[in-house]
């Protein structure tokens, strides 16, 4: 059993967390891009990003394991070098390319809480996760801002226990149904849904699917003092429901309200529309781009 990781800093429990940054494809601001990160910071939100590995082992800020949905290229992210990925433009972005985690850390620089998801590399939430966690730990050792790391796969976080013990670590969780997780064996799905990896991993928090927050396992985790975040609400109504049990929400598809007393946040300014003469994010509906609706 691992020692419990540090608790989440208070900043993660205040301002809502922008899922993959504050993105809006209609305005050329693509998920997990530098523009989406800047917009989230300027609006006073926390930030969630996703990490996939390059062929060279570098940590790239990108959600999918293939390039097809978000670029004009095809094929696996892990088959390209960081240098090559850094030259690939994100579609409809006006020329933005895929950033590294190091670039995003330098951009955020402690100005917003940063929640990092390590994407599963095993394919079935098993132990074959490769060295991605080691690279992330290496990058975070000297980072001074509020940051936490999480994954659906507990094995993806194992290297951080020793390599980055001061970084809060948590699990992304849900009910793990066979419909949504067909490659994961039934016994493993049951263990994940029951949150049996929390204690062995020493996880300080969970981020749980918002519709399943009343799960007995979630309520037990909360009673044990673990912070409960949730994913991914897409309307004020869903946020209100989720906040009955969750300590904070991860959101997209609308503009969540930032509490005036949100800990660890500077006073938010209106996040600008990046288009010349744009109306500004807060003056119009935030449009949800097409793409996967999972975490």
Name the predicted role of every residue range:
Residues 1-295:
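Phosphate-group recognition and catalysis centered on beta-loop-alpha active-site segments
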């Amino acid at each position: 059993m691992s020692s419990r990781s540090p608790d989440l800093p208070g900043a993660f429990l205040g301002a809502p967390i922008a899922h993959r940054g504050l993105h809006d494809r209609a305005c050329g601001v693509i998920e997990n891009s530098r523009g989406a990160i800047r917009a989230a910071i300027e609006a006073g939100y926390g930030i969630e990003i996703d990490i996939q590995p390059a062929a060279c082992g570098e940590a790239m800020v990108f959600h999918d394991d293939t390039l097809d949905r978000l670029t004009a290229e095809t094929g696996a992210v892990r088959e390209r070098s960081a240098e090559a990925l850094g030259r690939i433009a994100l579609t409809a972005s006006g020329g933005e390319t895929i950033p590294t985690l190091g670039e995003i850390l330098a951009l955020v620089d402690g100005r917003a809480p940063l929640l990092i998801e390590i994407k599963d590399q095993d394919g079935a939430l098993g132990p074959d996760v490769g060295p991605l966690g080691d690279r992330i730990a290496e990058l975070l050792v000297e980072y001074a801002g509020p940051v936490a790391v999480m994954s659906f796969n507990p094995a993806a976080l194992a290297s951080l226990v020793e390599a980055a013990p001061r970084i809060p670590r948590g699990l992304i969780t849900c009910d793990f149904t066979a419909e949504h997780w067909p490659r994961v064996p039934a016994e493993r799905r049951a263990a994940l849904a029951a949150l049996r990896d929390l204690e062995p991993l020493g996880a300080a928090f969970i981020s749980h699917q918002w519709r399943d927050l009343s799960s007995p396992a979630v309520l037990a985790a909360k009673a044990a003092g673990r912070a409960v975040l949730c994913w991914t609400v897409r309307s004020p109504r869903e946020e209100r429901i989720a906040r009955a049990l969750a300590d904070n929400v991860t959101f997209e598809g609308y503009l969540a309200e930032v509490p005036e007393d949100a800990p660890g946040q500077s006073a938010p300014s209106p996040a600008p529309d990046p288009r010349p003469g744009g109306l500004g994010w807060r003056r119009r509906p935030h449009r949800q781009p097409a793409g996967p609706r999972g975490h």
